[in-house]
């Protein structure tokens, strides 16, 4: 019998922080030498994002071991999220509150099992915003990650480079059913 997956939602960072860091470290192990992917850089972003409106995280556990995560927060028309995307996104997205999916990751043994989609959908299920946006490195997995998001209904919106150490990312958006 396959162990069941337990999805837990967190609205506070403290009880989830170490598990988020642990899974991130495992998921991004081959990139941790790059400044943007260093655990310290992720921890700084995580702490900053938690202070932003609407923060929520979902962690997946198998037998109490964290195996995947996603976290998001709300962005509005004045948020730097939108200001860094070129070309400028349509007002249809920027003139309202939307969910920004900041991070999602699943440990290697559980990739390709649908866990990422379960985490994603659980995170969005309780949201009231009409759209969700994310940024993806179009080179991740030789384009596989971008194609996965397209299969989930996301469409390209533009490009963004959130920091000088960051790769150029593709901003994507989709409606929340």
Question: Can you say where each PLM-predicted feature lies in the sequence?
Answer:
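Conserved acetyl-CoA-binding loop-helix of GNAT-fold acetyltransferases
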Residues: 100-108, 112-125, 147-151
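Short amphipathic alpha-helix that is part of the acyltransferase structural core
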Residues: 1-44, 57-66
